[in-house]
Structures are given as C-alpha cells and as structure tokens.
Amino acid sequence: MKAVVLALTLAFVAGQNFAPEFAAGKTYVYKYEALILGGLPEEGLARAGLKISTKLLLSAADQNTYMLKLVEPELSEYSGIWPKDPAVPATKLTAALAPQLAIPIKFEYTNGVVGKVFAPEEVSTLVLNIYRGILNILQLNIKKTHKVYDLQEVGTQGVCKTLYSISEDARIENILLTKTRDLSNCQERLNKDIGLAYTEKCDKCQEETKNLRGTTTLSYVLKPVADAVMILKAYVNELIQFSPFSEANGAAQMRTKQSLEFLEIEKEPIPSVKAEYRHRGSLKYEFSDELLQTPLQLIKISDAPAQVAEVLKHLATYNIEDVHENAPLKFLELVQLLRIARYEDLEMYWNQYKKMSPHRHWFLDTIPATGTFAGLRFIKEKFMAEEITIAEAAQAFITAVHMVTADPEVIKLFESLVDSDKVVENPLLREVVFLGYGTMVNKYCNKTVDCPVELIKPIQQRLSDAIAKNEEENIILYIKVLGNAGHPSSFKSLTKIMPIHGTAAVSLPMTIHVEAIMALRNIAKKESRMVQELALQLYMDKALHPELRMLSCIVLFETSPSMGLVTTVANSVKTEENLQVASFTYSHMKSLSRSPATIHPDVAAACSAAMKILGTKLDRLSLRYSKAVHVDLYNSSLAVGAAATAFYINDAATFMPKSFVAKTKGFIAGSTAEVLEIGANIEGLQELILKNPALSESTDRITKMKRVIKALSEWRSLPTSKPLASVYVKFFGQEIGFANIDKPMIDKAVKFGKELPIQEYGREALKALLLSGINFHYAKPVLAAEMRRILPTVAGIPMELSLYSAAVAAASVEIKPNTSPRLSADFDVKTLLETDVELKAEIRPMVAMDTYAVMGLNTDIFQAALVARAKLHSVVPAKIAARLNIKEGDFKLEALPVDVPENITSMNVTTFAVARNIEEPLVERITPLLPTKVLVPIPIRRHTSKLDPTRNSMLDSSELLPMEEEDVEPIPEYKFRRFAKKYCAKHIGVGLKACFKFASQNGASIQDIVLYKLAGSHNFSFSVTPIEGEVVERLEMEVKVGAKAAEKLVKRINLSEDEETEEGGPVLVKLNKILSSRRNSSSSSSSSSSSSSESRSSRSSSSSSSSSRSSRKIDLAARTNSSSSSSSRRSRSSSSSSSSSSSSSSSSSSSSRRSSSSSSSSSSSSSRSSRRVNSTRSSSSSSRTSSASSLASFFSDSSSSSSSSDRRSKEVMEKFQRLHKKMVASGSSASSVEAIYKEKKYLGEEEAVVAVILRAVKADKRMVGYQLGFYLDKPNARVQIIVANISSDSNWRICADAVVLSKHKVTTKISWGEQCRKYSTNVTGETGIVSSSPAARLRVSWERLPSTLKRYGKMVNKYVPVKILSDLIHTKRENSTRNISVIAVATSEKTIDIITKTPMSSVYNVTMHLPMCIPIDEIKGLSPFDEVIDKIHFMVSKAAAAECSFVEDTLYTFNNRSYKNKMPSSCYQVAAQDCTDELKFMVLLRKDSSEQHHINVKISEIDIDMFPKDDNVTVKVNEMEIPPPACLTATQQLPLKIKTKRRGLAVYAPSHGLQEVYFDRKTWRIKVADWMKGKTCGLCGKADGEIRQEYHTPNGRVAKNSISFAHSWILPAESCRDASECRLKLESVQLEKQLTIHGEDSTCFSVEPVPRCLPGCLPVKTTPVTVGFSCLASDPQTSVYDRSVDLRQTTQAHLACSCNTKCS
C-alpha cells in the first residue's frame, strides 16, 4: 500500500515543482556539522583538522531570495590519534569570529540552484566561504523525468561533472537522492598555484597514476510537501587524496564530512541586520588572504614594525659565529611579515635599517623572496634613487623575477625599467631586466587563457627597429626576450628574421638566425603545429647552413612530431648529402627511440620505426660529426624520472665542436620541468687563440689576391666568421643570463684591467692581512623552493599542498698575523722576504636548511595540517696556523684543535600533525604521525553524532551513512619498526674517528610501501670525534727547501750500511741480519719468497748460451753485465735491481720450445684495422713490413727464432740505436746503473734538497707520521725519494730511485716495506727510432708484489675480463718472467702501433688511429720554430690540421678523397685558399711545359714561389731567389717561416691558418689549421668532412665528377702574351646538336665552365669531360652558370694549346 502511495506521490510531484523550497513566513531550523581531517587512511595514526558545529536558521527574505544565519557556532581543533583523541574546542577563535558568524547572509535560490550571494563588508571572505560550504548542500538540479543523469554542476569547488541518482524509500515515503561529484573531471576547477609557473603537466605520467584525485558524495533524504520537497537530512562525504609517488606507494588523504539535519520550523523570521548587503560573488569559493599565508606558522601581527625589528635583530645577532638552527624558520617569518607590508611600510623599514650593515643585508635579501609587487617596486625605486648598489640591485632583480607573481601591474613595472637610462647604461642589469621582462610575460600567460598581445608588443617593436638599424647585439637580446616570453604572437616577428629562401632575412648574420630558431621552443609549447611546420621547412632546405638545419631538428623533435613526420625526416636522412646533418638527425632519433614509454611515448615509437628505415650505416661516423645524445630514466613506482640531453654540433669536422647544448629535465608527482640548460658556442675560440692577431688590411695584399680570384668563373666567397664565443644559462626553461665574447670585448677587458690599480689593491690587501688581520662574517638566506597548490574543500575551507625549502648559509673567517721582526706600516717586498710570517686562521662554514612538505588546512586564522619536516644543520670548523720564512726556505702548516659540535652534519626528518590558531599564537597542538606508545587494543565506543540519537530505518540504506558510526571496533595495534645503524672508521695516526649514524622509526609495518617508510622519524648524523687514548694535539706539515733540508728529517739513513741507525749498536744490527737470513731460509720452498730470485739466477747461469744468443736481439738499452745475475746474496738490493735484466733474457727450455713452435706456425698477416688485437704465444709475423711485426721480435726470449726474425731484429736494433750513439760519453749503461747503486745506496745529507714532514703530535707528546726526503745527485743525474715512518718502532719506508742514463733513457727502482726490502719493482723508459719512426718503450719488472694487488686484479678481471690482466694475475707459473713491456711506435702522425708483452710471453699488437696528429717532427727535434711560444702554437695547430697531398699523379683532398688531376699546361690552378673575404692565404699550382710542378704561396704581402731547378728545389720570395739551404725565420712583421725539410722545402704560417706547405720534385703537401676547416676551397676541397659534397666549384655548385671540378679551379689567361704561358680560358660551351625540349627546338649551353684555347690557338692536348647543359629556346637574361641542368653530355676540354703569331 505504501508503495502505491509513494508512486502516486512521485507522479503528483512530477507535475509540480520538484525542487527544495522554503515557504515564506517560516524559519527552518537545521543542525549543521562539518569535520575536515587530514592524514593517512589507517586509524590509530595522527590526523589534524577542524570541526564546525552550529544551528542554521533559514528563511525567505524576498521572492527567490533567502536569508541564512548561524546560531551558537563552535569551532574545534583536532590534532591527535584518530579516533582515540577528541577534538579540542577553540573557544578563543570562536569568540573572535562570533561577531562575523552572527551576521546573516542573503542568497538567491531558484529551483534548487544557488545564485548570487550577498553579505555586509564586515563578513570576511573566510566566513563567507564557510557559508558557501553550507549553501553547497542546498544546490540541487533535480530533473523531473530522469532518475539517473549527469551534468556539469556549479559547486563550491567549481564546475564539475556530477552524477544524480534518485530512488524512493517505500517504508517511510521519502525520496532518496545521491549525487556524486568527480573533482578530476571539471570544466572549471578552482585552485591556485604558486611557484609552479615553470612546471608542465606530464599527461602520460598522469595516465598511469593520478597524483591528486578527489570525489564528493552528497546523500539526501527529501520529503515531498505541497508544492516542492523539503530536505530532511543530508550527508556529505568528500575524499581528496594526494600521492607524491604512484598510488600503489600510498597516499595521504583529506576527508571532509558534513551533515545537515532538519530540526523544526519556527514562525519567527530571522531578525534583520542594519547593514548594507553587497553582492559578494556566487556559490564558487573565493580566494583571500590564504594566498599570502605560509602554512608553516601563524603570526599574529599586532605591531608589525616591532615584530620586524625583533626578527631582524635575531637574524643579525645569532648568525655570526654560528648559524642558528631556527634561522631558516626565522627567515620565513621575516618573509611572511614583509609579504603583507605595503610599499610605504617597506620604505619606513628601509629608512630605519639602511645604515645598519647586518640588518640592511638581511632586509635586502628578504625583499625579493616576498614575491610581492610592493617588494619589486621597492627594489626599483631604491635602485633609481641610487640607494642600493648595482650588485645589490642585480641580485635582487634576479631573485624577484622568479619569485614575484606575474600580473599586468608587474609587467608594466618591468616595461618601465627597460626604458630607464640607469638600466641601459649597465650591461649586466640591462640583460637581467630585459630577460626578466620576457619571463614575467611567460609566467602571466601560462595562467591566463587569453594572453594580451599588448604585453609583448613593445619588444616586438624594438626588434623591428633594431633590424632596420642593423644593431646585431640588440637584435639578439630582443630575440632572447621573445624566446623567454614564448607568446604565440611573436611567431610572426621571428619568422621575419628566419633564413627562408627569397627573403631579406637571408642576409642577416647567422648568429641571429641561430637565436631566432632556438627562440621557437617556448612558443612550441603553446602552438606546436605552427612551429612544427616552420621547423620542418627549415630542416628540409638543403641550401641552408648545416648548423641551422640541426637546430631546426632540435626544435622539430621538441614539438612531439607524429609518426608520419618522423618518417618523412628519416627518408630525408637516407638521401642527405651533408654528413653533419645526417649524423646529428640519426643520433637524435636513435637516442629518442630508447626513451621510456612514459616520457616520450609517441616520439619514441616513431623514432623506433625510423631506425628500421635508416639501418646502422650512419653509426660508423666518428665523433667529429655532430651528435645528439638523450638519456632518460623513469620509475613508475615512484613516479619520479630524469632526462638529460646533449647536442654536439659541428659543421666542418673540426677537432673542437662549434657549439654544444646540455640540458636536464625532471619528472615528479605527475609534473615535469626543464631544470637546467647550458649552451655554448665556441666556433671562433680556436681562431681567436691561434689566428694572427691582426691581419694586414693593406690595399696591396687584398688587391693581389682579389686579382687572382677574379679570374675564377663566378667566384663566390664564403661569409667571414666573426671570432666569437658565447654562453648562456637557462633555469626552468627561462634564460637568466648570457655572454658573448669576442676580440673587442677581450681587448676592452684587458685595457680596463690595465687601467685599474690592481697592484695597489694587492699591496693594500697584503698590508691589511699582515698588519691587522682579517675578521669576516657573511650570511646568505635563500628561499630555495616555495611550491603551493591551494584548493577548496566542499566545506568551504581551503586545503593546501605545499613544499617549502629555506636555507641560511654563513661563513666566519678570522685571520690573526704575527711577524718577526714586526713589519712597519710601509714595508716593502724586500723586507717581507726577510721576515718570519705566522698566520693563524679560524674558518667556520655553516649551513642550516629546513624543508617542509605540508598537506592540510591553511587560513590566516587557523591551520591544521600533516607536516613532514627535514632539518639539516652542518658546521665544519677548522683552525689552521701557517708559518713561512722565505729566506730560510721554511714552511710549516698546523691544524690545531678546534671546538667541534657533537655532529658536524645532522639531518632530522619528522612527520607530525599540527593544529594552531591565531588567537593562541603560542599554542601548537603537535602530534607525531606515528604514536610514541603502542596502543592497547581495547574496545572504544566512538563519539556518536547527536544528529541522529536513535537508529532509524533510513540509516539501514547503503546509500546514506552518518558522519560517525556507532560500531565498537578495537583500534589496531601497530608495532612500528625501529632501526638504528652506526658505521665508524678511525685513523690512529690523526687520532680521529668518523661515524655515520642512522636511526629510523617508520610505518613500514602498516604497509611496506614508500610513503609509510618515510612516515615517522629519521635521523642522519655525521660526527668526527677524538679517539680515546689517542688524542692528537695538532697535525703538522713542515717543508724545508735548500741545502739544510736534511736538518728537518726525523730519521736518518746510514750512508754506509743497509740498515737504519738504531739504539743498541752493532750487536742488534748483526742479530737482525742473522734473524733475517733464517727467515729467508725457512721460506725458500715458497715460490713467492725472496729466495726465488736466487733460483732464477742459477737457472739464468745454467742457460747462459741461450741467454747470450737471445741477448743479440734488440734491448732498447745498452747491454747488461751478465755478472750481475751472480751477485752476492748479501746485497738483496743489487739482486733485485738486476732481476729485470736477467729474467728478461732467461727462460726455461720448455718455454723456448713452445715459443719457437708457436713462432713458426703463426705466419698469418696482420691487418691495419683500428684496435685489432692479435694475441699469440710468441712474435706474430706480418705480411707487411711494419714496425709492429718488427717489434714483435723484441719480446722473444727464445734462442730458436728463425734467421729472418734474427735479421729483422738486428736491423731494427741498429735503426733504434741511432739516437743512442752519444750515450757512451755519459757513461750511461746498465752496468753503470749497478755501479751507481753499489757505490752509494742512499744519497747523503748533502744531496738532500727538500724535506717534508707530515706528523701528528699526540697529547703525550708522541709523534706519528711520515717524512719525505728528496735527494738530488746532479753529477750522476740521479734523484732519490725516501718516504719513512717516523715512529721509533717502525722500519717501514718507500724508496724510489731514478737515474737519467741519457736524454733517451731513464730507469727507476721503487721498493717498499720493512727497510724497503719486502717489495720492489723496476721501471725503465726509453725512446728511439724503429724504421725511421719514433718509438718509446716502458718496461716494468718486479721481484715481489703485495697479494692485495693480485686480489684486486682478480676482482676487476671478473667484471672486466681482459686477457692482458689475466696474464698478469698468473705470473707465478714456472714459465712467467715477472715483467711486462710496452712499446709504442708512431708509424705515422695519426697511427700508433702498441705492442705489449706479458709475463706469460704473450704478445698483443694493437694499431690505434688517433683523432689528431702527433708532432713527430717535434719529437725528433725538427720543429720549424725556435721560440717556445711559437713551438707550442705550431704544435697545437698541427695536432688537428687537415692534409692535402699529391703523390704519383693522384691528389688526395683534405677529406681524404682521391682523384687524378689532369693539369693544364702552364696554367695555375688554385690548390687551396682561404675562401672567406679575409683571404689569409692562397696556394697556386701549375705544371710547366717540361711537366714540372710549380707552387706559388701568397701570405700577407709575401709571394713565395717554389719550383725545381737542376736537382734541387728553389724558392723565391717576392721575386728574390734565396740561395740554398733556403731558410727564412719568422718575425713579428713576417708571420711565416721557410725551411729545408727532407728533400724539399716547407713553408709554415700557422697563425694565418696555413699550417704547412711542403714541396719537392715529386710530391707536395698542404696542411691547414683546424680552425680553417670548412673555410678553404680549391683542388684540395673544403676540409669539412663532407665527402658526399666534395667537389665544390668556385660558384658553390657541387660538380658531379673530379675532372669538371678540377677544371673549374683553373686561372685562365687574359691574353696570349701572358707571362705564365697559359693559353686557356674558361667558357660555357654550346652543345653541337640542337635538342627538342618540351616541343621546342632548344640550344644548350654548359652550366659548368670548360677550359678552351684562346682565340688564335689550337688545342694540342685534350681530355673528355662530362658537364651539365641547360637548354632554352631563347637567350634568357640570367647567367648561364645560374641555370638548372637539363642533361649531361660529354665534351672536350683543352689542356694545352699552340698559338700562332696572330694570337692576341
């Protein structure tokens, strides 16, 4: 029956107004409660929040206008263990808000929809938002004909998708309505972001896991009444969860529960208030003072000036000697106080503190951190009034740019600054302000849907004016500003200066084009499609400079191109002729193809497909070609990632790159940000350093060279590059600074430096240091991070997610001088040299940093939040005393005891819930997130809401849940994990112990995930403390230089005995020897004992015949006296020193047999491939006559080698020892080394030149440490270093002895252990020549080495298996020789053969190809320059020079391409020249009638002719012949040198880019400096590494064959009377037959010049050449050389002509 009644009721209501209504003349009384709590989901943990309880009076005030009043409101704070602890009434806060809460508000309400809200001005925005939270419950959009539907509905939090569900309760005849609002699906979501202007949303990251989710459920019980429905009950349950990581790793929650229960209807209306009601918005939340309020502390401002004064005093007083642990929080308090200050207040504070140095410093550092317009205006006004320095202004502006919230008012202020003369006059400030202007526009546009074009128009206009005036520096600056702003309207302005074909912008300098392309990247973030099209157009333009195309590629891939676009680029790369562009694009796509799917999913997939198209061919290009590297990592579980990208751009395959860019990107919590980017252009750095300082601009030089090149057909010079180095820095995608360095700037800086009285400043600083000392304190506060997101809850209370990080760094330096004798005030340097100076310094660097992560409620009157706080404090004090006596050569440094805190560095991380309110500023209710005591699981009856004291049937519905249930449940018990570890390391010598301690109590026992592991408390600390019983009084280092150095040595070495002098006399010495010999005898059975050397000596003696035969092989050093192998057993040192020679010449017979058989069987030839390793048991024979194969025989210890190997070894030995002929005079042989050691094992005190003592002085005056003695024996060219332990009970020491046997050989013996006897090794290094190639050998032999070396070697070999290392590990086998030899032979300037012989007699041969040239001639002492500076200059230039050569009628270009050059008779060809307008050099080549080559070199005003004459090569300089031997020395006026070299002559002019021109009767060779690569042209090519575009003709066209290319570089004759006897001219030839093109008869002319005889001459020598022809029906106006090619045909080119007398 009830169901029927309800059905009839619903049917009746469907025809009526189905919306809540409140009848006029009645007052509806409701009870309202709201509880907002934040914390982790589990019960038994701490939460913080706010509770609101009140009665509501609701009545109609007018038609569709209602009045709402709160009665007996009560606010309660919650900070405790939920649900055990109760909320605490905030009586004072309630009383403070009571006057506002007592004022009723009015609102429009029509058909269940809340409209405008009205309230008096006395009602604050905060209280009005609480009303909005109540009105949100009344918002009902009920449709008459639908039971389930959704719509975008207005609510407190914005306009979000809301799902309605309507049902009926047949038992009580009520309507049940539920609506669910998805806060992640909103048309308009109300929130405010602060400090997040530079972050971007990572869409793909958010697809995998949502970091911020929210949903609101509202459940209603509606009762049908006469004309509408009445709300009986309403429950609201909202959940907002935030996960800093992935959702699987835990999330913190903010829960809001509201309840509204109908109580009664009163007939008395709500009493009216005498106040003016104003329109105060709508149902939507309104942001207010919470934007300025930090969530870390509440400050009740009663007397702002006094509070500011107190905080400033605290910061200035307590951060001098040490940084106070609360300094960061106090700094944040000062920020908060100044953030709410008006400009007038700041002016008042400034006048009060500007003359108080520490207060002024703290004040100026805090103002920019406030991020307010008033603060920015204050900085501007003080700078304009010159009350702050330029340094203070620059620092303040840089900080303010990134802290100030951007709005039109702030942008206008920056606009006024850019016009200020004071800013324009200072380059640094001008740059900061202009770039800041662009940043402000960018920040404002990021948060505004429609960003006004007017904001950026001033810069666009400036750019247009600068282009019109050709002001390059200003153009670059304005482009950077537009790039920072990233406004889409700037796209048109930037397009106008792009190097698009056919536009006027093509003529602009390339630096402008570079900046314009890079400025597109920020625009691409908003208009990717538009930028994408332009970038692709630039990239596909093959005529564009390669660097610009590569930059376009960077921009293109930052726009997230589609699969089709990436495929288009890949197909373009397949046919790309420029290898720089191909290499860069390929490497870029390859790097992106490996990117994780989360970071670049679409681009990575597209690039993976592109890699399949391209293959791996381009992988073989070397590092001289441009590359892009992208590396990224993303952890989905933590939702954290990082990416790093590096672009290496080159355009001429030079040794140094033209430019590079490196940038990093971070991913965290679903957002991404470009953290840091650094770029540099060093294109002109080499040229700036190595180029001749000033080229002569004389008319004669320029005219001569231009006259020559004018003869070339359609000559077009390359643009002259301006020597320039530039660097820029970007932070969060915004350029914050850049610098362009060129020659004028350097000259200006040098001039400025000369004008400054630097010497005077230095003298005054030295006087201040030595007379009065230094006492310096400095502190710097930094607000490193302030990132906030504020969003309203359904109850109208704002919640906040924020991250704060503040730090205060300080340093205290105090230096006290003491001089003896005391210096006068006007002392000079001479006096100082005779003064004993002592300085005592105490240094205390300190830092304190606080970091807060907050989630909770934040208003200007109350706060309740969950907080994670990390406090870092670090102090590293040091006290040092230094003493210097230059006259005596004494230096002493002491580290003195200093007060060290318990922990040098400590960090405490705690998580807690906190609640506070403004009326009780000294009361903070803090509850640790994890309870400190384990909870007892006893049943607790929870607090039951009084809204429904009796359970009724309505509560049985699953759709409606009361705010707090009555179920009795035990509170869960958690056993929280406690973890503590301590790691210590101590050093007895210095008496200190260092400990790292870690203690943690976390919630991993609740859930073993990241968030719960971080919850709780954690402590990290690092301490350094004295060791008990080993306290050190001080650490000392003493240095003594000079003849009296030995006086400082603590331990003396006996000059006649092997032992140290010890107390006890000779008896103890003899006893020591006896015990030592017994120890040796007892260990004779061990292979590693010292007696093994004796057994090897005996084996060596028994096989003397084998050794004598083997010793005939090359030994790089003079022969060793064989008697050394049988030296007395008493002299262990002598035995050890000779072991290397004896072991290298002796081996077992089995080893010899194996070596012989292996040698005879290994006859395979070795190739010259780079780094190919041949490993054999003996020498590998090679099919080619190479130094590698010859040197392989050096290592054969066998006497049964083949005769050919013996002959080769003997031949190589003779060649190698050519440079050792002069060694005999110095007496440097192996036997002399033994004689030197035998004569005097230890050098005496008179040879000591340096003594160094390192010691620690203990509290009981004991000294421990080491001494180092440096001895020099000049007559024998011997150096000895002895390091000894100065403890009386220790005989440990290191002995190193080096003897220079000749200028080509040095040997070193190193031994260590007890009395330098336990371990020893010999190292011999020598140089020589093998097959005319410089060579060097390093031989290392040892007697015994520590076992730890072998252990570590095994560990390394386990992870990095290397055969050589494996051989070294197994040296204890019977056939091992305990030595290793390495020989390096420079077979050419770019290749080295390295041959290594291991102790297992294995030989490894590696041929290495080097990226640069080895200065072989300089090694041989054949440098063309005598001065050291000139030599260095020459060698640096030569290292990466490009070479072009002519050998046996084949020309090898700079790019190593070869072709046959069919040279014309008597006509010059341009072999190589500087193709820029500077014309630094030119090399011409011709062949005379007798088929002899002539070379002409033009450098500066000098003409050099080299040609064969008789059997020699002759040189003329400016038509004056220089008699042999030709030699011309470089001078400042003559920047070149001519020198005889081998069988010819060589010209050197590296400062002009011409490294070397060598010429003899059969060959010639041209080398250009590395910085000239890409700027040359001629027969030798451009030296740019572009082998696919090798044949560039003078007009820039690429010829299809080498013949046409070579002919284009002929210098034609002007007439038959030309002195050079050249009778050729270059002309376009007509094709003999006519062709029909497009239906018309056309005449065809060659578009490439062809050499033909002059009129009146007949060809006597021709050659066929294929050239391109252009065919047209009529004669066009354009030059034939500019036409396109229609077909290619073969024609005849003339090479030699015969002329008659009529030839003119």
Curated annotation (Swiss-Prot):
Disulfide bonds: 1444-1580, 1467-1616
Tissue specificity statement from the Swiss-Prot or TrEMBL entry: Produced by the liver, secreted into the blood and then sequestered by receptor mediated endocytosis into growing oocytes, where it is generally cleaved, giving rise to the respective yolk components composed of complex suite of small cleavage products.
Keyword vocabulary terms for this entry: Disulfide bond, Glycoprotein, Phosphoprotein, Signal, Storage protein
Keyword Lipoprotein: no
Domain VWFD: 1442-1617
Stretch forming the signal peptide: 1-14
MF annotations from Gene Ontology: lipid transporter activity; nutrient reservoir activity
One Gene Ontology biological process: response to estradiol
Stretch list, region Disordered: 1078-1213
PROSITE patterns: VITELLOGENIN, VWFD
Protein name: Vitellogenin-1
InterPro entries, A to Z: Lipid_transp_b-sht_shell (IPR015819), Lipovitellin_superhlx_dom (IPR011030), Vitellinogen_b-sht_N (IPR015816), Vitellinogen_b-sht_shell (IPR015258), Vitellinogen_b-sht_shell_sf (IPR037088), Vitellinogen_open_b-sht (IPR015255), Vitellinogen_open_b-sht_sub1 (IPR015817), Vitellogenin/Apolipophorin (IPR050733)
Function of the protein: Precursor of the major egg-yolk proteins that are sources of nutrients during early development of oviparous organisms.
Biased composition (Low complexity): 1078-1109, 1122-1204
Changes after translation: Phosvitin, an egg yolk storage protein, is one of the most highly phosphorylated (10%) proteins in nature.
All residue ranges annotated as the Vitellogenin domain in the record: 22-660
Pfam families for this protein: Vit_b-sht_shell, Vit_open_b-sht, Vitellogenin_N, VWD
Gene (name only): vtg1
Residues that carry a glycan: 446, 635, 903, 908, 1019, 1054, 1080, 1121, 1174, 1285, 1322, 1375, 1379, 1405, 1456, 1512
